[in-house]
């Protein structure tokens, strides 16, 4: 798709192709649904999603010059991402930034094997003739570098449809939280940007807190706050594991001071010349928040959570 048709496609619903870079880590799967496709094999990883641009999805959405994933893309890719198991293999989406060609078709059934294979072959040919422009180097690497693919048995992919249904494209806080974890994973690919990965995880932490507060208020708790969110977290995650009630009183209280000092060079904690963070902060937040978002989306824990409860109960 080129010229005016391409420009028009950015202002309406269309089939958006995303190529994923070998810097990421992906499940070796083919998820084919009528309006969404994810394909990962040894040679290429890509998605095709019948997607609506943000400004079409919501004309009141704030202006941004950042070319990032559309709401339908975050919803679909998020449903795969949330399918991770506790303390197991980690998915790391790494889309080629700013590159999202459109398919010149009004309607496609992406659940058909023949359609998916035809798209896959077209992408492979396109990668072979990638221009050396803004994306040429990365697209060439997608063809020449080796992908890191995960055994799908390490994931709860049978829950992917449940997560897809549970993440609404109108739930901007959930979308922001999930996409912030995507960004945190991308940044963590570079040692020098690990601090920024933690900052992105802090954004996801704030999103999870707001989602829990809204859930509690929807259940009748007036003016729910950090203490209520901490009790909710203990009740749904720690107590079933037989863990003692924590001494901290606020939601993820152990990160509160760090977050303030990281985001505010001067605060009531004094002047901070650098962020007081560690690599473990990222790994802890990444694991915990993914599981919290998954629970909020599905309304239940995955089988791996119950396996851990039983295992701890037998000790």
PLM segments and residue spans:
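Short, solvent-exposed loop/turn segments at secondary-structure junctions
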Residues: 99, 206, 268-269
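Generic detector of ordered secondary-structure context
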Residues: 176, 196, 216, 251-254, ...
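Charged, non-catalytic interaction/linker regions at domain boundaries
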Residues: 1-199, 203, 283, 287-315
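Flexible secondary-structure boundary motifs
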Residues: 199-250
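General structural signal for alpha-helix termini and helix-helix connectors
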Residues: 186-190, 214, 264-268
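Charge-enriched, short contiguous segments at helix-coil
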Residues: 139, 245-310
